[in-house]
Regions:
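Glycine-rich beta-strand-to-loop/alpha-helix junction loops that act as flexible
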Residues: 39, 177-178, 207-216, 244-246
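A short, N-terminal amphipathic alpha-helix
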Residues: 21-31, 69
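Active-site-proximal beta-alpha core segment in soluble small-molecule metabolic enzymes
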Residues: 34-206, 228-231, 272
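Short, glycine-/Ser/Thr-/acidic-enriched flexible segments
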Residues: 17, 43, 66, 107, ...
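A non-catalytic, amphipathic alpha-helix used as a structural packing/dimerization or gating element
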Residues: 16-24, 192
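Generic N-terminal amphipathic, Lys/Arg-enriched alpha-helix
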Residues: 1-12
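Charged (often Lys/Glu-rich) extended helix/loop segments that serve as interaction or gating elements
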Residues: 228, 239, 244-323
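Charged helix-capping and loop-helix junction motifs
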Residues: 187-192, 221-227, 257, 323
């Protein structure tokens, strides 16, 4: 079937490019011994899970339903993190997950009994907050922003230890501080992790460096990434995990859409599409950013300039201006 024969709106996945990305990620795994997981919140096209599972170690989930999807469709390592878990969800999570990461000490203590009574061994981790911001321009995605709810600061962890927390049952630490960044930001973050939590790393089995690593981007510094991985692996005798999302599927697909109408207001020609930023590309509004459009230019660069918008009733549901 040709692209112009597809019913729209429609996501089209380029398996060739997806495989190229997976080969890059698998190369990092082979050279460093790190285990790389698919972050399903970024890409959950489960039809591709058998392909992804041939190259990566497993998946990470942001809740019960993603964890269930990974369990059913990939069947490899199944990690889950959520800022707070519902007690009734934990009953199923302990059956289908291998690693469960808690956002706070109180969450760990709340669910500890179910984990210890589970029929299988579950590796428990805590999400830490190294309080090291490396992002500029999109603070909405910065887990280290002042007052962040994500991760445990060293001050909070020390208080819990003083109050009797037994860290011997915690096998790993997890941090996720990056967003579409290069490995220099990881290097900066690791320096903060070592400064604040280094003394505790020696007693752990694994360290999960989270996502936000743009590993498959053409200009990404993979050599620096691998040095970071091997430094933490060798110094602290840790198994290292990474959980990229966008890097798995970067540039490996398209959103096909159809122009339904053209309206004009104040000299602006506006295309009404059968797609929506709010529904199909929420980051366009939340980040915000201007998604690339095939064969287009900046406004005014080419002969015709249009504003791309949607058929929803949200006035601000606009993708951007293109020529």
């Amino acid at each position: 079937m040709k692209i112009d024969e597809l019913r729209t709106p429609c996501y089209v996945i380029d398996e060739g490019k997806l495989t190229e990305n997976l080969l890059i990620l698998n190369g990092v795994m082979q050279r460093t011994g790190a285990r790389i997981l698919l972050a399903q919140k970024a890409f959950s096209a489960f039809y591709e899970y058998p392909l992804i599972g041939r190259y990566l170690s497993g998946t990470t989930a942001s809740g019960l339903f993603e964890a269930r999807l990974a369990h059913e469709e990939m069947g490899k390592e199944n990690h889950v993190f959520c800022p707070a878990f519902l007690p009734q969800e934990m009953d199923e999570l302990v059956e289908i997950c291998d690693h469960i990461v808690f956002n706070s000490v109180s969450q760990y203590l709340l669910h500890r009994d179910k984990i210890e009574k589970a029929d299988k061994k579950i590796s428990v981790g805590l999400r830490i907050n190294p309080e090291c911001s490396t992002q500029e321009g999109h603070e909405i995605y910065d887990p280290c922003a002042p007052g962040s709810r994500l991760g445990i600061t060293r001050e909070a962890l020390d208080k819990a230890i003083k109050n009797g927390l037994d860290l011997s049952r915690i096998e790993g630490f997890h941090f996720h501080t990056l967003c579409e960044q290069d490995s220099d930001a990881l290097e900066t973050t690791l320096a903060a992790v070592e400064e604040k939590f280094g003394d505790l790393l020696y007693g752990l089995k694994w360290l999960n460096m989270g996502g936000g690593h743009h590993i498959t981007r053409a200009d990404y510094d993979i050599e620096r990434l691998e040095k970071c991985i091997m430094h933490m692996r060798d110094k602290y005798d840790l198994e290292i995990y990474l959980e990229p999302g966008e890097a798995v599927a970067l540039d490996a697909g398209y959103l096909e859409t159809t122009v339904l109408d053209i309206v004009e207001n104040n000299g602006i020609k506006i295309l009404i599409l059968d797609t929506s930023a709010a529904c199909h590309m929420p980051d366009v509004l939340e980040m915000p950013y201007r998604p690339p459009l095939m064969d287009s230019g900046e406004p005014g660069e080419k002969k015709y300039t249009y504003r791309l918008s949607s058929c929803t009733c949200l006035a601000g549901d606009v993708l951007g201006d293109y020529s």
